[in-house]
Amino acid sequence: MQNYFQLLELPQEYNIDLKILEKQYFAMQIKYHPDKAKTVQEKEQNLIIATELNKAYSTLKDALKRAEYMLLLQNINLNDEKIRSLLSPLELSIFWNEMERIENTILFSDLEKIKHKYELMQQQNINSLKQAFEKRNLSDATIHTSKLKYIRTLQNKLQEKIKSCK
């Protein structure tokens, strides 16, 4: 498996330009499209590359997946147990309280307010991640990635609740 940044010919940094990512992805998809192959072997090879390009693009375009991938490149694998150990008891308590808050909220307008709050939390955390990766501070990057993962869990739970209210 080739490094996703190298595959898409991008600098290996967290703060990537998503428009350039998309442009590179589509250019590479055209270049390695299986239908452009002249031989069966070439077609098979292009199919493998196209599949890797899809994985690379879906990973790098998502802030959380990109952070997890960059940590993985540094041999830091964030499993659920490790993530829980990175957050303080207070942070975990806040997370569970937020889960209960979502569960107990009835009004759609209140759910929208919560959604806005989580979007702000996510953006602040992404900004912290950018700084941590720029400074090559893997400890902070790991902590902020775990926080972002919790925020994403809250956002997913909230989306389910909003759908059930419609």
Swiss-Prot record:
Keywords: Chaperone. The keyword Chaperone applies. It holds the Pfam family DnaJ. GO terms for molecular function: ATPase activator activity; protein-folding chaperone binding. The keyword Repeat does not apply. One of its GO terms (biological process) is protein folding. Residues 3-73 form the J domain. SUPFAM superfamilies: Chaperone J-domain, HSC20 (HSCB), C-terminal oligomerisation domain. Transmembrane segments: none annotated. Signal peptide: none annotated. NCBIfam families: hscB. Co-chaperone involved in the maturation of iron-sulfur cluster-containing proteins. Seems to help targeting proteins to be folded toward HscA. Interacts with HscA and stimulates its ATPase activity. Belongs to the HscB family. HAMAP family: HscB. This is Co-chaperone protein HscB homolog. It comes from Rickettsia typhi (strain ATCC VR-144 / Wilmington).
